[in-house]
A protein has these predicted regions:
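Cytoplasmic-side transmembrane-helix entry/capping segments in multi-pass membrane proteins
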Residues: 1, 52-62, 106-118, 135-140, ...
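Specific alpha-helical transmembrane segments that line the substrate/conduction pathway
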Residues: 25, 32, 73-102, 219-236
């Protein structure tokens, strides 16, 4: 999951620069470039492309592309850091969904730790009274669908290879992203081509390792680690974009790490 969050943070940094390209077009390029990796891996290793749990695989693809599209759309209305932070309502939704769909139990102390980490995410970027209402709605719905992604992957379990799961997601995203971007297509120029292809590279590794994580561990144990993506994104902001963060940002990072460590220790004792 740590490898996954680092890869997604790199992808977020790229999205930050693609302000002139529509969300569905970004979805298309992010997905189509990943297909070279997924199809290549499956063919090389003689893994059945269609998989076993086909209905769940299709559902995972549809839920995933919905969440991803809404997230990219929200970045047009919200700062990328704010969008990434607010998307981290997803593990909270995943933990709640896991109670009903996976029959997992979450102890009261774990809810306290989840809350601590979530408060840290909010503090990390501060409270902005000028946030766009439409953007907030988009990112909120994106977080709900992202939480559902975790549940579907857990339902698939070890019945399908992680790359098969990712491949379904990429195929569905390529088709839907391509079709929905036709009317608003913008021809990339220069370095934008490299950035768009980079979306697929980082997105591929992010999806594969996230899928592996949820296949081998309980949702309520793995999902909170997704908060690390916020930390990685902020570090990239400092290193690549010379962004400056306040003491409130440092407090937010401390709360996130503290909440995750306490949850891991608590789960270990149980």
């Amino acid at each position: 999951m740590i490898i996954s969050t680092l890869a997604f943070a790199c992808m977020n940094a790229i999205v930050k620069h693609l302000t002139d390209i529509g969300a569905f077009q970004i979805v298309f390029f992010r997905s189509v470039s990943s297909l070279f990796f997924t199809f290549g891996f499956l063919i090389k290793n003689n893994i059945p492309i269609l998989g076993n749990n086909r209905k769940l695989l299709i559902l995972r693809g549809l839920v995933g592309v919905t969440s991803m599209s809404l997230f990219f759309m929200s970045t047009k209305y919200l700062p990328i850091g704010t969008a990434v932070s607010l998307r981290y309502m997803a593990p909270i939704f995943a933990a709640v969904f896991a109670i009903f769909f996976l029959k997992e139990k979450i102890k009261p102390f774990q809810w306290l730790f989840f809350t601590m980490a979530f408060v840290g995410v909010l503090i990390l970027k501060g409270f902005d009274t000028n946030l766009d209402g439409y953007g907030l709605i988009l990112i909120f719905i994106s977080a709900i669908f992202s939480g559902l992604v975790y549940i579907v992957i857990s339902k698939i379990g070890k019945g399908d290879h992680p790359v098969v799961v990712v491949n379904y997601f990429m195929v569905i995203s390529t088709v839907l992203g391509g079709v929905l971007s036709i009317n608003n297509w913008v021809n990339p120029e220069g370095i934008e081509w490299i950035m768009l292809l980079g979306l697929g590279l980082f997105g591929y590794f992010g999806q594969v390792y996230m899928t592996k994580a949820f296949q081998i561990a309980a949702t309520n144990q793995v999902a909170p680690l997704k908060y690390l993506e916020v930390i990685f994104t902020l570090l990239l902001g400092v290193l690549l974009f010379s962004e400056i963060y306040t003491l409130y940002s440092l407090l937010g990072i401390a709360l996130i790490i503290f909440g995750l460590v306490l949850n891991a220790l608590y789960k270990g004792k149980k």
